[in-house]
Amino acid sequence: MNEQEQPRRRRRRLYRTSADWFGLATVALLMICSLVLLVQLMSTKLLTDLYLIVIEVILLLINAGHVIIQLPIRRVKTSKVVCGLLAVLLSGLMLYGSVAAASGKSALLAIAGHTLQKTTSYVVVMDDDPARSIGDTVGYTFGILSEDADISADNTQALLDDIKDGLGGRVDTSTCTDLTSLADALYDGNAGAIILNSSYLTTLDSLEDYSTFSKDTRIIYEFSTTKEVEPIKPNASITSQPFIVYCSGIDARSSDINIQSLSDVNILAVIHPRTHQILLINTPRDYYVPLARNGQRDKLTHAGMYGIDESAAVLGNLYGVKADYYARVNFAGLKKIVDALDGVDVNSEHEFTTVGMEVPDENGDGVHMAGYTFTQGINHLNGEQALCFARERHAFGDGDNQRGKNQMAVIRAIVDKASSPAILKGYQKVLDAVSSSFITSLTYEDISSLVQMQLRDNVHWNITSYSVSGEGGMEPCYSAGNETLWVMWPNATQIN
């Protein structure tokens, strides 16, 4: 009898089938993807310990459940196949989460701890000049600014050294003492070409006698240098002590956010993490203030020609404070950020229609004219509408002052949308938009500390704004060669 039962027992023994091996393979895949996700999330330093513990427990339970189902050999394989397919799906979601976490970290690293400052100079000729490239300027006399008048004298010299070999080893130059004299040298034919810092083009266009300079001339060569500024060390008390961020908005032709440029938006953001208060102080771009570098009076916007640290120092001197950090956005970038957020709700103090203005095309290769009408109260705006809303000044009697208020209204709307769960919908688009059009001197560690605070406390920020004003008049401006320009004298009562 024992000999007869022995074959039967052997026949009842269960062996692993392809379904079993599939299940075990999916368990291994699930474990690997879980580990990758956990490592990526921890490396971002954006999540609090509580969030990480919850995620770890969830991952542990998921993996334990799959092991319990897949490890034993079972006669019925349906549960193993279904569980294996579920493991594949979960692994895919975990890999997606890992990629999203890595993308978020890369985007923050790209904008945080900014230490580069880029200076760009152009070789400019008249629009009807036959020269189409720098090689066509052999024998030309190049007009340059004197060293004490040139905001980028080192870059000008580096440009001359760069083109010298291609022009027969010699470059003839003619030195001018101020910006308008340099432009006149080109118009009068005393110089075949001139070398200009990129910021000077906007400055010349703002002068009444040179308002068509950009249309009358053509850039045939561009030369840039970058220098590294001293990085700011992480602030261990950034989530507990007040700090000030200088917010600069530029409207540069170049899409490069690092380039030195006039600063059209100048806002000091005073942030108090403990009380969850943010005070935005807007200062008009035409404020007539002493430059920090030499004490010469100029428009506030012109301070940006010397670098963002100069603009921050000028505002610091004006209000008797010191900006701890700076943040900078290009107007073209503002459009991208708002679109990535699927629009923002902006509160307008007035009903107004914008004067037609140039805004960037979708592909970024050109511009087109746009104009919009905004109602008093809440307006849901896309990127282009928000850009026009923030730029407009000609529709208001107190132009620059109201524009500053509108800019702060847009900033408030962006902060509200970005700090809400709605941001998760377009997470990747927002990251792409921010990383290409926004920089800050806040370190990655500082930003991660603030993000953790937001997640931990679910903070709702109370944002208030304040704008200073003044009396307008015509005064000489240092960066424009002491040309007389319309400026705004600061209101001492408001500032003090």
Predicted features and spans:
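Hydrophobic alpha-helical transmembrane segments in integral membrane proteins
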Residues: 95-113
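Membrane-interfacial loop-to-transmembrane-helix junctions in polytopic alpha-helical membrane proteins
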Residues: 15-18, 48, 75-79
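Internal/C-terminal transmembrane anchor helices
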Residues: 77-100
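Terminal targeting segments of Actinobacterial cell-envelope proteins
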Residues: 1-16
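Membrane-embedded alpha-helical segments of integral membrane proteins
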Residues: 19-69
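Structural signal for the C-terminal ends of transmembrane alpha-helices
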Residues: 68-76
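Non-catalytic, solvent-exposed segments at the cell envelope interface
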Residues: 109-119, 124-128, 133-135, 140-496
